[in-house]
Amino acid sequence: MPKRTDISSILIIGAGPIVIGQACEFDYSGVQACKALRAEGYRIILVNSNPATIMTDPDVADATYIEPITPEMVAKIIEKERPDALLPTMGGQTALNTALALEADGTLAKFGVEMIGAKAEVIDKAEDRQKFRDAMDKLGLESPRSRACHTLDEAMEGLEFVGLPAIIRPSFTLAGTGGGIAYNVEEFKEIVERGLDLSPTTEVLVEESVLGWKEYEMEVVRDKADNCIIVCSIENIDPMGVHTGDSITVAPALTLTDKEYQWMRAASIAVLREIGVETGGSNVQFAVNPADGRMVVIEMNPRVSRSSALASKATGFPIAKVAARLAVGYTLDELKNDITGGATPASFEPSIDYVVTKIPRFAFEKYPGSEPLLTTAMKSVGEVMAIGRTFKESVQKALRGLETGLSGFDEVEIAGADDPDNGKEAVIRALGVPTPDRLRVIAQAFRHGLTVDEVNAACSYEPWFLRQIAEIVRQEGWVKAGGLPQTAQGFRELKAQGFSDARLAKLTASTEKAVRAARQALNVRPVFKRIDSCAGEFLASTPYMYSTYEFGALGQIPQCESDPSAAKKAVILGGGPNRIGQGIEFDYCCCHAAFALDQIGVESIMVNCNPETVSTDYDTSDRLYFEPLTAEDVLELLHVEMSKGTLAGVIVQFGGQTPLKLAHALEEAGVPILGTSPDAIDLAEDRERFQQLLNGLNIAQPENAIARSWDEARAEGDKIGFPFVMRPSYVLGGRGMEIIRDHEAMERYIAGAGEISLEHPILLDHYLSRATEVDVDALCDGKDVFVAGVLEHIEEAGVHSGDSACSMPPFSLKAETVEELKRQTVQMALALNVRGLMNVQFAIEEPHSDNPRIYVLEVNPRASRTVPFVAKTIGQPVAAIAAKIMAGESLASFGLKDVPYDHIAVKEAVFPFARFAGVDTVLGPEMRSTGEVMGLDWKRDGETGMGPAFARAFAKSQLGGGVKLPTKGTAFVSVKESDKPWIVEPVKLLQAAGFKVLSTEGTQAYLAAQGVQVEHVKKVLEGRPHIVDVMKNGGVQLVFNTTEGKQALEDSFEIRRTALMMKVPYYTTSAGALAAAQAIAGAPAEALDVRPLQSYAAE
């Protein structure tokens, strides 16, 4: 069927901010869909609240709305734009649930909008647990015994039917949110109540436990002529009980018999037909009982998902692009496969002759109080993917690509394992607990002498995978005993098992450099193979490569398929797996670098190992290497690329800390670095050198010191005086950073921090309390400087910049203060000889007085996480311009002007606290947010100043982050001593808006002295009914709670946690409270209007 001509405009709903379970993969799918449908001539309207995405760039869709993704706001966009169709399958659970709400409330019918890609009844049938189960029964496919329940009483009846342990799965939630495994009745009740609360339809499925079963997924694409293909089979190495997003997975499935595979293939196609998915990709999940082969269907996603991003990158088959075109009427046989240059149609099922391994990355260390346990609710924040010719090569590449300091199956300590009497029991106990380290625990168990059968009994991993790991451990023993192989054949055999030079160095008590020299002396180097989706059957025209050391049965080395070009080229190093502090913002910059190089005729070569991202899409750059970002892997691909053509250099300043760590190794190897020199980057990171630079420029810094021993740290701390901030040098995302307020806190920090040394000193900075923090992003070519953005933080200094809301332009700073910040930024950029991007963080004491004091906190001569937000606000492709400057263009040639604009943008951080029980939500100097949203609004006619526009933009940023500010009700206000003067105005604003205000004794007395009367409520420790009781009874709609000091934090912990669980908006800084009060007073939700991004740029 040719494409539909009865529709001309299509609305695509994005996924919103990056949260656990919904990350960059939806930027990747959204970009593919927009590009594919625009190429077909449709007008594309896009809504997404996340500014750090490529899809929200003004040239990706025809009308781009950076607005909150709520049914009310999307309805306003529909009313304004009148699209013919809505495609809800590209934006994860957020888009599906929003589309269903618009269908249910009659918006789609009212404006004549047709849902394409998946109809409402299809989504409902797939996502509603009971309807899905009924559909499986109809097909004669088994699913686990289960009951759908809408109340706790119904769930208790369901429990009698399924027994304990039981799995609880809420309907219509993302990545297992609210679900879990209950081993006893108390846990069961707790999980069911939470699940019912978090499910938008108040429904949970109580399901028999299939813990320990093998888990598989099938990625299926179907068109309206009923052509179906399996793009990829995926096997979870972790057994059932661990969410598939937290599981280590391999593609293709490696341990299915052909009979089982064919059964699963037929079953997944039958599932799509029965559910009614007519156009597009879906994934179907199965569980297999290893004891008797019983096979059951677990669930399906009727949309593009995290697994489909993995399947796309694993095979080279662009699922999202194909799904988008199927949604407008094409059939699979009418579409060409890009990877083979159109030699095969899209109906040609991909086949692969390599093994892909995905390992998730976790951030439990960022959430003190959370247990690093894996369950059916997803907790990982990122993932790495690696490709090898064998499972061993693939899994070892993935382990080093995680960037958690591993070089392979590094040793891990198991508590009690060395006990001569009970050591074996300790190892078996450790194997039974699903943690992020379980793969290494398995390897360690083999080192302790356990057999494959014993390990299998303890952790339910498939014996085939266990034998592979046992072989790796055995080989490590041989290397330890006999040293490095002396022949090329022997060395190649080792490298073909995936051993990194760094791991071999550890095993032989040598250095990585020495191992590399020995390997290269024997001329043992990897070859590069192409991902072609057809296992070499047709010629691949797309340069999408991975490395391997594989060799033939007779020792012959396979042909290298890299085929580097003779062009002028530049290599962009990506950011690797997502983590807190380094995420999609950096991928955004890497993509822009590739686009910019393309525009100036330089070949772009991308290196990255994150399967979720746009940067690892085969058509983002000219050439793509899917490789771990380690010195060894990068130097090997550069060796091949430099054999032909001219390498202009490597770009290291766009991928966050990951590529910067490689800059020195590259420089030593004689590889040119584009942009700011590694020495200048070092100068900005090196405390003492940077201080000299600032002194020379007469720029102030908070009093600070550097300590190389704990005694020195204590002495320096006493000199600076409390409070001060302590942190290790060279970190991203505020890792290990803490505000120290007394000697006790200092000793606690020292006890938990480990060793410090000459190489790894500790930094101390005087903490500027009540200072306003400001971020400045600038472009520099060594001669001229353009200040792209000045962002005023809403939370005061002391909250990590990545976790603070901020406003651009500044909402309260004086014009002369902003000018002074720009002047100092220009001075530093020129002094550091920056070429490309630079970010400065300032703190301003008494910013509103006649004499504000400006201090520089830090300078980063690289891309910062605010770059995409700044680019969207000023309508300039900041990252792309930076890339062109690095390639030699002058800043002056872009004609950038600092022009005032009549709109205001607010960036707000989004946190995953709800997924980590027992974690305090108070903000501090260590970054804990996973993503961000942008609220954008403009000055209306007749408004004086930006105040009203700021209130609306702030309200939108809260709404986009999932916080709906109340318009009436009761607010609870309790603040620390130093904040009391700053809480009077927010309370007055709330009372004027009709709110009742409750306060604890101290805050109430202070407000009364200022002539503001509020009602008293007891603290938790003062007897009942106390504030938490009132909150649990639904008596509070808004919380302002600020604290300091260990005891006060502990006392008020329950208030913040209850607010989170009851979905009550809460603010833990006085500045955040003021912004919220202004938004409530000045911007009720119905007053919010929508406007496309393109119209702001045209101002």
Curated annotation (Swiss-Prot):
SMART domains hit by this protein: CPSase_L_D3 (SM01096), MGS (SM00851)
What top-level class of enzyme does the UniProt entry assign? ligase
Residues given in the record as Mg(2+) 3 binding sites: 841, 858
GO CC annotations on file: cytoplasm
* Enzyme nomenclature, EC number: 6.3.4.16, 6.3.5.5
Which species is this UniProt entry from? Caulobacter vibrioides (strain ATCC 19089 / CIP 103742 / CB 15) (Caulobacter crescentus)
This entry's Gene Ontology molecular function terms read: ATP binding; carbamoyl-phosphate synthase (ammonia) activity; carbamoyl-phosphate synthase (glutamine-hydrolyzing) activity; metal ion binding
Q: Give the region (Oligomerization domain) as residue ranges.
A: 404-562
State whether it acts alone or in a complex, and with which partners, per the record. Answer: Composed of two chains; the small (or glutamine) chain promotes the hydrolysis of glutamine to ammonia, which is used by the large (or ammonia) chain to synthesize carbamoyl phosphate. Tetramer of heterodimers (alpha,beta)4.
State the taxonomy lineage: Bacteria, Pseudomonadati, Pseudomonadota, Alphaproteobacteria, Caulobacterales
Tell me the residue numbers annotated for binding Mn(2+) 3: 841, 858
Q: What is this protein called?
A: Carbamoyl phosphate synthase large chain
Annotated segments matching region Carboxyphosphate synthetic domain: 1-403
Could you say which residues bind Mn(2+) 4 here? Answer: 858, 860
Q: Which residues form the ATP-grasp domain?
A: 133-328, 691-887
